[in-house]
A protein has these predicted regions:
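N-terminal secretory signal peptides
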Residues: 1-6, 14-27
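Exported/periplasmic ABC-transporter solute-binding proteins
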Residues: 2-6, 30-97, 101-114, 121-312
Length: 312
């Protein structure tokens, strides 16, 4: 599923008029905190809504947002939802500046913005996603330790033979600074250790990584699970643990993030309605998993802004 800017499809004039998704008393933004998915029921309700919702941010879950937006606009033809996935940092900066109504992020806003910016935003945790290393089809390595990943992504390990593979130079495809996927990966691999290694390329989006990994031999990168594509590259184990959702729910697989959608406390009604929909059963009950993500309700652990993991 390649990343692309999502443009509004106008469904005005649908015969019979579709039921609105907006509930009475929208509280997704503007209150002390966002409602949890468990608090949200069916999306069907009585009031209509109109307006324009715009977003930017993480490319890792852009496809989930796009799929939800399609359903939301089907039922709310007077609402336009559009946006793109230019990275968590850009999305958070944009929503804080008011140039978009929603900022999508793989990381907590506290890690990218100043405190006075964060206090004006409301966080909606819409999903959890695993992220893991991927290697080219010709690479004969199917498991790496965190220490080996640290060596590769710091430039200390440069040949596949050093980690059990063939004698070939490792091509490191990194993500650009500001990427939430990169921040999540580096936090899991390096902890608090500072790292400034660009690799052989720094790519903008998850879709760019998919494309480059599919056409480059001896390469390594990292992607969220929803962008894994075994026709182009191989997802590998970390510390002997398979990169799959079941191993993320209890933190057996260590590289994962919560997907956040931030809005301003004084967000407009259309934005509130769409974010309420993201937390509704219509999205959380089925769509999240269909798109390769994990419902927040399925997690046995939680991770805070500092990266500390604790049991629910």
């Amino acid at each position: 599923m390649l990343d692309q800017a999502y443009s509004r499809r106008q469904f005005l004039g649908l015969a019979g008029g579709l039921a609105s998704i907006v509930g009475l008393g929208l509280v997704g933004c503007g209150g002390a905190g966002a409602p949890s998915a468990a608090d949200k029921g069916s999306a069907a309700a009585a009031e209509s809504v109109s307006g324009e919702v715009t977003y930017d941010g993480a490319s890792s879950f852009q496809a989930l947002v796009e799929a939800a937006a399609e359903k939301f606009m089907d039922a709310n033809p007077d609402v336009s939802v559009s946006g793109s996935g230019n990275g968590s940092g850009k999305g958070l900066t944009a929503v804080a500046a008011g140039t978009v109504t929603i900022g999508n992020s793989d990381v907590f806003a506290e890690t990218k913005l100043e405190a006075d910016q964060v206090k004006n935003l409301v966080d909606h945790e819409v999903a959890v996603v695993g992220m893991g290393p991927v290697v080219s089809k010709n690479v004969k390595v199917d498991d790496l330790s965190l220490e080996q990943l640290k060596g590769i992504f710091s430039g200390q390990i440069t040949n596949w033979k050093e980690v059990g593979g063939d004698d070939a130079t490792i091509v490191v495809l990194n993500r650009k600074a500001g990427s939430g996927t990169r921040a999540t990966f580096e936090a899991a691999v390096f902890g608090d250790e500072a790292v400034d290694f660009k690799g052989d390329a720094e790519l903008d989006k998850s879709g760019d990584v998919q494309t480059q990994m599919g056409s480059t031999d001896n390469a390594i990168s990292y992607l969220d699970f929803s962008h894994f594509d075994d026709s182009k590259f191989n997802a590998i184990k970390v510390e002997g643990v398979e990169p799959k959702s079941a191993n993320v729910t209890d933190d057996s697989f260590k590289i994962w993030a919560t997907e956040h959608m931030y809005c301003a406390k004084d967000a407009d009604e259309a934005t509130k309605a769409f974010l309420d929909f993201m937390l509704s059963d219509d999205v959380q009950g089925k769509l999240v998993e269909e798109q390769g993500f994990i419902p927040v309700s399925a997690m046995k652990v939680v991770k805070d802004a500092s990266g500390k993991v604790s049991a629910k």
